[in-house]
């Protein structure tokens, strides 16, 4: 098996990318948090302690944890990578020609460790030691950001997702997250862990405007046996799914993409906030959103250039057929109607499967975790009182790059 390979949602998890977003979280305020796609300001100290616990939990299960900031710092050791990244992140069109050049010169004075921290965590105008002949600088408040922080990098699942033997470097839906993709492009292109391997790359062209073809990894479930399940959501569009499907089929990395329609609502912004795969025939679902009658389409290749797209009448039957199963064990969100809604909001259904029947989940979702336990699912609990306020659970916060198939 290629070391860079994700063959399922439930096979043995071997290696993941996580991000510990200290600088970015410290730049969140009540004034800017909504523009940065957070509902509230997190306690930085508590969030980092919770993230450290998450890392330790994975390492105790023999999962190799790579941190995004370390990968970016190591990538910046390559002069070509550094030049490319600064060219695209500090462009003339974003800052104006004179100001952009001076920002780049200033950033090049920093160590790779400091530069990685700034690119991920942000930089305010007041931190610049120079005054440029720039209207942008002159018109900006000193505490505005020259380089906006990227706190959503916490959710490494979204920006890139490995699908069998390839990786999708996703065109993000929201402006606050679009810069994230170039960090992953640089890492996958130049970091020694990836640059010496041959693997398929989707949406890799940084110069292409992908328009309405947006896709985020939280909507992508690699359910195994050559099938991919994708949610049509507020972040992932039909155009994005069809373009991904075409690339998967062209590179022979999948035989079928199953698309299901989600409500365009923040409480279920991605498929994995309402549905995750826990064991061979076991799924966690939020029943107010996921049911057998929801809109469902099967996408398969039609020759070399076209897609065969069929609307399907029963989602559960499509899922069982794809996985070659006779039945499904559906575990719904726990508690009464009020408790289930609260626990889904706090990512009760967003679990990270370590191996069949073993998952990492927030300990606060007691009603749902109890149902998992009764169904024979072993829960590795982590604290998520702060991290969960970012609207993401263990699956959201992890990007597997090596996982066994089924």
Swiss-Prot record:
> What biological-process GO terms show up in the record?
arginine catabolic process to ornithine; arginine deiminase pathway; bioluminescence
Q: What Gene3D superfamilies does this protein map onto?
A: Arginine deiminase, L-arginine/glycine Amidinotransferase, Chain A
Check the record and name the InterPro entries matching this protein.
Arg_deiminase
One cellular component term (GO) for this entry is: cytoplasm
EC number(s) from the headed UniProt entry: 3.5.3.6
Annotated Pfam families: ADI
Which reactions is this enzyme annotated as catalysing? L-arginine + H2O = L-citrulline + NH4(+)
Indicate the residues that form the catalytic site. 396 (amidino-cysteine intermediate)
Q: Name one GO molecular function term.
A: arginine deiminase activity
Question: Which compartment or compartments is the protein found in?
Answer: Cytoplasm
How is this protein named in the record?
A: Arginine deiminase
Native source species: Aliivibrio fischeri (strain ATCC 700601 / ES114) (Vibrio fischeri)
